Amino acid sequence: MSALETQALGMIPMVIEQSGRGERSYDIYSRLLKERVIFLVGEVNDQTANLVVAQLLFLESENPDKDISFYINSPGGSVTAGMAIYDTMQFIKPDVSTLCCGFAASMGAFLLAAGAKGKRYSLPNSKIMIHQVLGGARGQATDIEIHARDILRTKEQMNRILAERTGQPIEKVKADTERDYFMTADEAKDYGIVDQVIAKRP
């Protein structure tokens, strides 16, 4: 890949607005934030979680009674980072409407299901995947044992929340998350991860 192509991949479109006082340029994500739209694109990690949490809190302070739209296209990532987003979504006053555009896997699917009931959507050709928590403990046997216990506790916690959010029996969620469980948008609706599959805006 050429240097030019690499640079182009990192480019963020700018939007220019004109007013009586002149012109002002925004990056596209800042402009959409003005419309109460937040994007989660790519891996869930501490950096992306901090950005999403900050945007959620900012939009709540702007208007605690107006919904926030949360667009997700993510393969998942860190459980602790994802739980920071999840807890903030439940903590703030505005309803958070979620929409999968592309792929929502692992923590991405978990956050998709975390939206306000009745306001969780998927575009028709999106894919959703759930699975169990991944661990990568190394070190002394005692340390590995401590991490293993924590992973099992986290797995139980996430399965319980997913069961509550989807309406599925906990035993079914446990069985389905043992391995990668892929769903189409319609299958995710049947499962209870989303409430509606939409092809066009209402």
UniProtKB/Swiss-Prot annotation:
The active site is at residues 106, 131. It catalyses: Hydrolysis of proteins to small peptides in the presence of ATP and magnesium. alpha-casein is the usual test substrate. In the absence of ATP, only oligopeptides shorter than five residues are hydrolyzed (such as succinyl-Leu-Tyr-|-NHMec, and Leu-Tyr-Leu-|-Tyr-Trp, in which cleavage of the -Tyr-|-Leu- and -Tyr-|-Trp bonds also occurs). Pfam families: CLP_protease. Gene3D superfamilies: 2-enoyl-CoA Hydratase, Chain A, domain 1. Its main location: cytoplasm. The keyword Coiled coil does not apply. It comes from the Bacteria. GO terms for molecular function: ATP-dependent peptidase activity; ATPase binding; serine-type endopeptidase activity. InterPro entries: ClpP, ClpP/crotonase-like_dom_sf, ClpP/TepA. CDD domains: S14_ClpP_2. GO terms for cellular component: cytoplasm; endopeptidase Clp complex. The keyword Magnesium does not apply. Belongs to the peptidase S14 family. PANTHER family: ATP-DEPENDENT CLP PROTEASE PROTEOLYTIC SUBUNIT (PTHR10381:SF70). HAMAP family: ClpP. Fourteen ClpP subunits assemble into 2 heptameric rings which stack back to back to give a disk-like structure with a central cavity, resembling the structure of eukaryotic proteasomes. This is ATP-dependent Clp protease proteolytic subunit. It comes from Acidovorax sp. (strain JS42). The gene is clpP.
